[in-house]
Regions:
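Membrane-embedded, hydrophobic transmembrane alpha-helices
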Residues: 1-193, 583
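Transmembrane alpha-helix segments characteristic
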Residues: 21-30, 197-207, 354, 540-546, ...
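Hydrophobic/aromatic-rich transmembrane helices and adjacent perimembrane loops
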Residues: 48, 169-175, 326, 370-371, ...
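Active-site lumenal/periplasmic loops and adjacent helix-entry segments of GT-C-fold
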Residues: 185-331, 596
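Membrane-interface helix-loop-helix junctions at transmembrane boundaries of multi-pass membrane enzymes
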Residues: 188-191, 347-348, 388-404, 521, ...
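Membrane-interface transmembrane helices that cradle and orient dolichyl/undecaprenyl
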Residues: 333-350
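Membrane-interface alpha helices of multi-pass inner-membrane proteins
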Residues: 339, 352-369
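Extracytoplasmic
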Residues: 431-505, 509, 516, 523-525, ...
Length: 746
């Protein structure tokens, strides 16, 4: 029994790793899933066991060859299970049409396929074949953590539901405070909690934070997820994945077509909630993976702080739930780091496991693959460079072998090229990005990068929203000149008579407490903005300090293994490149890259936060570091700005703000789209930006545009909110549909 566990009840149990019982239970689950009259709840339970439970149980046993810790094996087994589901769906989708079955992605073949996969895994898993007596033991401290975590999740679901019903975000704020309370408990009792309990607390905290955002709206809400869901629907409606039906990079990400189709078919969960709930819950494991990978090489405090920094970064709770393909890719990348840092297992067992996980990332998300390849390539170059320097200086080798090898990078690169090339022919965007980047480097072209670079210590020119709008108008006019001359687009003189202007992002009114601070001389809006800008600088500064301190300082908070130092250096160099090369900052996103980088360098940020308080006692420095990350968490998640006012609202806490106006789908929007769909067979969807409106097109204006008179366009990775010129449509078209929240012109 684990130290600190409480005695349980002696019961007759079959171990989950009992081969006959496991296979029998899985076969029964496959049968229940296949029967048309099985109740929905039974299908849900049976399907979850068939898709996730049984494979994860077997992968837990198999992964012991490359992962030494129990909780590490649990986490890696889940990642391998997700990859198994993707590969099984791909195999079924490829094999059945070849033998005359045009609809392979239906419940019966998928269920039978999963049963065969489980049977195959059972033959490889080192499991028993007998019944045994076992004790059910509850780890010490699990009760309070479970109660607090469950309360946070319930509050998060209730908070999102209240907001969707038009009520206030007060419950959502309380949910975040409950998450903060849970994190405080995890920190205060960190030495008494086992890794299992700490991981349980982290996954519950992360799930609550993510569900606050993912459950917003009764329909699919967010940016990338809108197209991701359409890719899923295309595969779902065809009962088959066919890249030729939509030959775009999104459709080459099997994490958003084959995986959700399999999950929906075998569990009965509607596809909409696979994206809004299942994927966020899987992604909630990523902070735990960060914790486990750091715990392999550092103290409990550093590992816990690392996971908290990963959760406190804004992209985690504002954007990740809107990028399902990246959620799955980050889950697999977290598993990669758990295996890399687990030095208790031999390299010959860990390297093949990492290679399999990296190939899973290739199938899940293209840009994550490219960034990982560059990071690993830089790490390998540093390793080779270090060996060369030692050889030139006639110094003996260090005796340690780097984890990353040339053949590992080569195989992943070949896999990526093969997948985006011959297999799917979706590598066009990469070629465009490379060509534009080369043009930037050679001075043959100039362009502005994403405004996200303004948060970087590496620099990045700031471009005003007004200038960005003018640039976009000029760009669209240039691109459409020939069509406009033929009369296909609205004439420029009409557009010139109704100029557009940028609308500044509105801030929440000051609360009572915020007004009190204002009366005593505190500029609350300025304070909120300063804290946000300072937070970005603090995180980057901590990263730099942590990397230097872990490498050169005499008094080190933790001794980073060479592999982690090299990978962190690679990720840091990559961030610098993304910042200074405009096209890369637009196509791959600096903030997303930093979130990905935290999987590698979170321990350096955490260690630097402790090291920066080294002038105090050891115990106090850790507490102050925890206070810093908690302050960042409460401010960046929106708790502090909501309590003060004077800052733009965040989607997870309010029915206002930029994300709400742009991405929140209202019933009026759907009604207008449905009305239009019933009256036209046109499928060519264009932009409503005035310079792109065609003379013969329908123009559907959304709820936010009709109610606020504002619309948003995207250019060079930035959103530009502008005053919509209704006069253009009034002068050139007729209004044929009008409701309380949407309008259509023709």
């Amino acid at each position: 029994m684990h130290r600190g566990s409480r005695p349980g009840w002696r019961v007759v149990l079959s171990r989950l790793t009992d081969r006959p019982a496991l296979l029998g239970g899985t076969a029964f689950a496959a049968l229940l899933v296949s029967l048309p009259w099985t109740p929905a709840l039974v299908v849900l339970v049976a399907g979850l066991w068939l898709v996730l439970g049984a494979p994860a149980t077997l992968w837990y046993s198999i992964s012991a060859r490359g992962v030494s810790t129990r909780d590490g094996r649990v986490l890696v087994s889940i990642g391998l299970t997700v990859l198994t589901a993707i590969l099984l769906a791909l195999l079924v989708n490829t094999a059945l049409p070849a033998i005359g079955a045009p609809h392979p992605l239906t419940r019966l073949p998928l269920g039978a396929g999963m049963l065969l996969v489980v049977t195959g895994l059972a033959t490889a898993a080192p499991i028993t074949g007998r019944w045994t007596w076992s004790r059910l033991a509850v780890p010490a401290g699990a009760g309070p953590v479970l109660l607090l975590g469950a309360a946070a999740i319930i509050l998060a679901v209730a908070g999102a539901t209240r907001l969707n019903n038009g009520l206030s975000g007060a419950v959502s704020v309380v949910a975040l405070l409950a998450v903060a309370a849970l994190l405080i408990v995890l920190f205060r009792r960190r030495e008494r909690h086992s890794s299992t309990v700490t991981g349980l607390g982290l996954v519950l905290a992360a799930a609550a934070v993510l569900l606050l955002n993912s459950l917003r709206g009764w329909f699919i809400t967010g940016h990338d997820i809108q197209l991701e869901y359409e890719v899923f629907r295309l595969t779902d409606n065809l009962d088959r994945w066919d890249i030729s039906a939509f030959r775009e990079p999104y459709n080459a990400c099997l994490s958003i077509n084959l995986l959700p189709v399999l999950l929906s078919r075998l569990t009965g969960i509607p596809g909409e909630y696979v994206f809004k709930a299942v994927f966020p819950l899987l992604f909630a494991l990523t902070p735990v993976l960060v914790y486990r990978s750091v715990r392999n090489v550092a103290s409990q405090a550093i590992a816990l702080l690392s996971a908290m920094y990963f959760m406190a970064f804004p992209t985690f709770f504002t954007d990740m739930t809107f990028m399902a393909r990246q959620e799955i890719a980050f889950l697999l990348l977290g598993c990669v780091m758990v295996v890399i840092t687990d030095a208790a297992r031999p390299l010959r067992a860990r390297r093949p496991l990492v290679l399999v996980l990296l190939l899973g990332i290739v199938l899940s998300h293209y840009s994550t693959t490219y960034l990982v390849l560059v990071t690993f390539g830089i790490a390998l170059g540093i390793d080779y460079g270090g060996r060369l320097v030692r050889r030139v200086r006639s110094r003996p080798p260090t005796g340690t072998t780097g984890f990353v090898t040339w053949w590992m990078i080569a195989l992943v690169a070949v896999g990526a090229v093969a997948w985006t090339g011959p297999a799917t022919d979706t590598g066009g965007q990469v070629r465009v990005t490379v060509a534009a980047t080369v043009g930037n480097l050679l001075g043959k072209s100039s362009a502005t990068g994403s405004s996200d670079t303004r948060y970087s210590l590496f620099g990045g020119a700031a471009v005003s929203a007004e200038q960005r709008l003018r640039d976009y108008v000029a760009f669209t006019e240039q691109q459409t000149g020939a069509e406009r001359a033929s009369g296909a687009l609205l004439p420029l003189p009409v557009l010139a008579g109704h100029p557009m202007s940028v609308v500044p992002e509105s801030a929440m009114p000051l609360t009572g407490f915020g007004a009190l601070l204002d009366r005593i001389g505190v500029n609350v809006p300025g304070f909120n903005g300063l804290v946000r800008q300072a937070a970005a600088g603090v995180l980057q500064l901590l990263l730099l300090v942590g990397l230097v301190a872990a490498t050169f300082a005499r008094r080190r908070t933790f001794r980073a293994p060479p592999d982690q130092i090299r990978l962190t250096t690679g990720a840091l160099v990559l961030l610098g490149v993304l910042t200074v090369l405009p096209q890369l900052s637009v196509d791959y996103g600096v903030l997303r890259a930093f979130q990905q980088g935290l999987i590698f360098f979170a321990p350096f940020v955490a260690a630097a936060s402790v090291w920066s308080f080294r002038w105090t006692t050891t115990r106090l420095s850790v507490r102050l570091a925890f206070g810093l990350v908690m302050a960042l968490f409460l401010d960046l998640t929106g708790v502090v700005p909501t309590l003060l006012g004077g800052y733009p609202a965040q989607l997870q806490l309010a029915n206002s703000g930029q994300y709400y106006d742009i991405y929140y789908v209202h019933p009026e929007d759907r009604s207008a789209a449905r009305w239009l769909g019933e009256r036209t067979s046109a499928t060519d969807v264009r932009d409503t930006f005035p310079t792109l409106v065609r003379t013969d097109s329908y123009v559907l204006l959304s709820y936010a545009t009709v109610h606020k008179g504002e619309a948003t366009a995207f250019y060079r990775g930035d959103a530009m909110t502008y005053r919509y010129p209704f006069g253009v449509l009034d002068a050139t078209k007729n209004k044929i549909y009008s409701s309380d929240g949407a309008a259509i012109y023709r």
